Design a protein with these regions (language model features):
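A short-motif feature that recognizes glycine-rich, charge-decorated loops
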Residues: 1-179
Length: 179
């Protein structure tokens, strides 16, 4: 009977020890977790990159190192700037998706890793009627899993991974291959 009691006591102590270890790991900084962290809002959803409403957007600017496309909201909907075309790009649909863009992963940049952000493959900017930036995002390469894409909010030190579908339409509008 003493051996059984000792076995249960040992099992209980091991369970408490593992629980304390998990708690300690969860409270450490992201650098201790391979350089990444998972970001969530109070409801448990991945944290939004920006807080704005698509109704406030008056301009969308897509820029690559070699070209740019500027769309303005007009009385008839979204119109590309003079001399530019946005065939197949639905700005209204994109803004509805982009305004909810979420990232549940942030990475501390590693100097030996390619992210496609220097320079970015694409910069997305959303402006309001007065020209103030509602959102800005640099878009880089596809992540190794093929499902996410490296992005960076200008001015933030960390790199984030967002689902690739969130950037597929603007990449296609700028004729950048988007799997």
């Amino acid at each position: 009977m003493n051996a059984a009691r000792a076995g249960w006591s040992l099992l209980l102590a091991a369970g408490i020890g593992l629980s304390l270890w998990q708690w300690r790991e969860a409270t450490e900084s992201p650098q201790r977790h391979g350089g990444h962290t998972h970001l969530h809002d109070d409801s448990g959803k991945p944290a939004r990159l920006h807080a704005w409403s698509p109704a406030d957007a008056a301009q969308v600017v897509l820029a690559t190192p070699g070209a740019s496309l500027r769309l303005r909201r007009g009385a008839q909907g979204w119109v590309a700037a003079a001399g530019q075309t946005a065939d197949g790009f639905d700005a209204e649909e994109f803004l509805a998706l982009f305004s909810q863009a979420r990232s549940d992963r942030a990475l501390v940049p590693q100097p030996d890793q390619p992210y496609g952000l220097t320079p970015p493959q694409l910069r997305i900017e959303v402006l309001d009627a007065s020209g103030a930036k509602l959102a800005s995002l640099d878009v880089g390469e596809l992540a190794p899993d093929g499902l996410g894409r490296y992005v960076q909010v200008p001015g933030e030190p960390e790199i984030r991974i967002v689902p690739n579908y969130q950037t597929r339409a603007p990449l296609a509008a700028m004729a950048i291959a988007a799997p």
